[in-house]
Curated annotation (Swiss-Prot):
Stretches the record annotates as G4: 136-139
GO MF annotation terms: GTP binding; GTPase activity; translation elongation factor activity
Gene name per UniProt: tuf
Subunit annotation: Monomer.
Organism per entry: Phytoplasma mali (strain AT)
Enzyme nomenclature, EC number: 3.6.5.3
Annotated protein name in UniProt: Elongation factor Tu
Reaction equations catalysed: GTP + H2O = GDP + phosphate + H(+)
Region G5: start-end pairs: 174-176
Residues annotated for GTP binding in this entry: 19-26, 81-85, 136-139
Function, as annotated: GTP hydrolase that promotes the GTP-dependent binding of aminoacyl-tRNA to the A-site of ribosomes during protein biosynthesis.
Length: 392
């Protein structure tokens, strides 16, 4: 853990880049840090530092979500770079669930593509209410009319998924040119729009502490660190938490708190933190569990839910499903197989239906009434739901 202290002298906002594979999300993230590093407001992160894994480097695509930190004159931003490849959408869901607002990156050269649409849908499902659009690769397009058509297409898409497409700000630029230092105007404009268009988030600090575990690391001689974004509440060093879901519930004492390699005296809703846990070994905690105030939450495996099943046009199923259908259910940072039971008077569920479902999961998950989830099958999102009542 670090010896530097994190200063809370600016509003902290979580943002991130979403969009189709190869449209420039990671290049844009790298360009933002490079430009702000010249003003002392960020640490310059190269493309290779953001796309970290061997497979990412070999394939030139982002697989895992990556966090970087930067500041403007007005705010401190935690920025998640989300994978755009269809195979890694579950990691994108985890990243998007941590954002207060999203930057949708669309290549002006290619226009709207399948993951553009899916990411906009998922952003809405995980509770993002505002997007900013960065039209990238504008330097490759000679006709102004083409860029205008792409912008109209994206605005229509945003309206379709209940974002305000007419008022959403669009910024044009080239992330690659900005990274090369030849055209930084688009990036400066984007940062200006982030500061102005995205309101200061209202943090849910009064409710009991809850943090979904996104990653787990070991610090030799110190203990195990759980990383994630605090969903609600506050926590201090020496307080006790419960580790809930997937396995037997365990208790642990917090011995350290850190955000972007700087120490915290407390963590609160909205913070991206590492929490050092005393007496917990690496194999006793995993991604998909949650840390919570003792007694505030339990793990369950059967519940009643209200769901919307996507139409074929929205990228969902082409056909109906029946009782005992077994898709994947995505909660916060985990996915679990479960089976569906339809209510007695319902014979089948069609794409486009809103309906009540009884869901039974293979493993217990920390849930309560109001917990949101996505339903996926065969690499695509087929529905979105909310837990309405716990059964067992």
């Amino acid at each position: 853990m670090s010896s530097k202290v994190f200063l809370r002298d600016k509003v902290h906002v979580n943002v991130g880049t979403i969009g189709h594979v190869d449209h420039g999300k990671t290049t844009l993230t790298a360009a933002i840090t490079k430009i702000l590093s010249t003003k002392g407001l960020a640490e310059n992160k190269s493309y290779d530092q953001i796309d970290k894994t061997k497979e990412e480097k070999e394939r030139g695509i982002t697989i895992n979500t990556t966090h970087v930190s930067y500041e403007t004159e007005k705010r401190h931003y935690a920025h998640v770079d989300c994978p755009g490849h269809a195979d890694y959408v579950k990691n994108m869901i985890t990243g998007a669930a941590q954002m207060d607002a999203g930057i949708l990156v669309v290549s002006a050269y290619h226009g709207v593509m399948p993951q553009t649409r899916e990411h906009v849908l998922l952003a809405g499902q995980v509770g993002i209410s505002k997007l900013i659009v960065f039209l990238n690769k504008c330097d490759l397009v000679k006709e102004e009319e083409w860029i205008h058509l792409v912008e109209m297409e994206v605005r229509e898409l945003l309206n379709e998924y209940k974002f305000d497409g007419d008022k959403t700000p669009f910024v044009r630029g080239s992330a690659l040119k900005a990274l090369e230092g030849t055209d930084v105007e688009g990036i400066n404009k984007l940062l200006e729009v982030l500061d102005e268009y995205i309101e200061d988030p209202i943090r849910d600090v009064e409710k009991p502490f809850l943090m979904p575990v996104e990653g787990v690391h070991t610090i030799t001689g110190r203990g195990t660190v759980a990383t994630g974004r605090v969903e609600r509440g506050k926590i201090k060093i020496s307080e006790e938490v419960e580790i809930i879901g997937l396995k037997e519930t365990k208790k642990a004492i917090i011995t350290g708190l850190e955000m972007f390699k700087k120490e915290l005296d407390f963590a609160q809703a909205g913070d991206n933190v590492g929490i050092l846990l005393r007496g917990i070994t690496r194999d006793q905690i995993e991604r998909g569990q949650v840390l919570a105030k003792p007694g505030s939450l339990n793990a369950y495996h059967k519940f009643l839910s209200q769901v919307y099943i996507l139409t074929q046009q929205e990228g969902g199923r082409h056909t109906a499903f029946f009782s005992n259908y077994r898709p994947q259910f995505y909660f916060r940072t985990t996915d679990v197989t479960g089976f569906i039971k339809l209510k007695k008077d319902v014979k089948m569920v069609l794409p486009g239906d809103r309906t009540e479902l009884i869901v039974e999961l293979n493993h217990p998950i920390a849930i309560e009434a109001g917990t949101k989830f996505s339903i996926r099958e065969g690499g695509r999102t087929i529905g979105a739901g909310t837990v309405t009542e716990i059964i067992e």
